[in-house]
């Protein structure tokens, strides 16, 4: 199953990652406000999320001439938030895309990745994300998903939880 392959590769990638948790750096990042993803989605009427994505496992390379900041700037005035794919191996994303977009665009940003470690939550906050995506199928134990939701809330996020069936919905709500 592709999700299992992505998650396995993500764990290996994180083991080799240069990112090291630094509480002072995280607290400094938390002093700076980020645009509220929740407020952008809770407004009256239709809410639109633009996506910055270079590739996908199903479609391959989507945009060969890929400039994430320029794509994000094109969304300004047309969308309420931006989803930034940061998964490197299958989507050709990068955490740096998120950081650069945050520096150049004043919209709520969703870090869209396969979160398998709390470090990814901390890193997302440091890079300027407004929230993160948690996939119930990846964090498929009640205590793990609940723990990650609490960690995300602890850094100021209201995480977006993706579910695929009734069991996962119950898991997310418990």
Predicted regions and their residues:
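Active-site-proximal loop->helix
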Residues: 123-127, 145-151
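Short beta->alpha connector loops at strand-helix junctions that form conserved
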Residues: 85-86, 112-113, 133-137
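Conserved N-terminal beta1-alpha1 strand-loop-helix module at the mouth
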Residues: 1-109, 116-118, 151, 156-174
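Short, charged, surface-exposed secondary-structure boundary motifs
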Residues: 119-120, 141-145
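Glycine-rich phosphate-binding active-site loops on the catalytic face of alpha/beta enzymes
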Residues: 126-143
């Amino acid at each position: 199953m592709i999700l299992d392959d992505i998650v396995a590769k993500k764990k290996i990638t994180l083991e080799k990652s240069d990112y090291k948790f630094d509480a002072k750096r995280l607290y400094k990042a938390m002093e700076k406000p980020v645009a509220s993803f929740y407020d952008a989605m809770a407004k009256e009427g239709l809410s639109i999320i633009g996506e910055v994505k270079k590739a996908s496992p199903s479609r391959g390379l989507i945009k060969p001439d890929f400039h994430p900041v320029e794509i994000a700037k094109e969304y300004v005035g047309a969308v309420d938030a931006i989803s930034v794919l940061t998964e490197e191996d299958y989507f050709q994303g990068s955490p740096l895309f998120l950081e650069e977009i945050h520096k150049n665009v004043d919209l709520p940003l969703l870090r869209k990745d396969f979160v398998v470690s709390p470090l990814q939550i901390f890193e997302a906050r440091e890079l300027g994300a407004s929230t993160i995506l948690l996939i119930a199928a990846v964090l498929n134990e009640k205590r793990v998903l609940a723990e990650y939701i609490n960690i995300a809330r602890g850094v100021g996020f209201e995480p977006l939880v993706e579910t695929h069936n009734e069991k996962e919905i119950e898991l997310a709500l418990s």
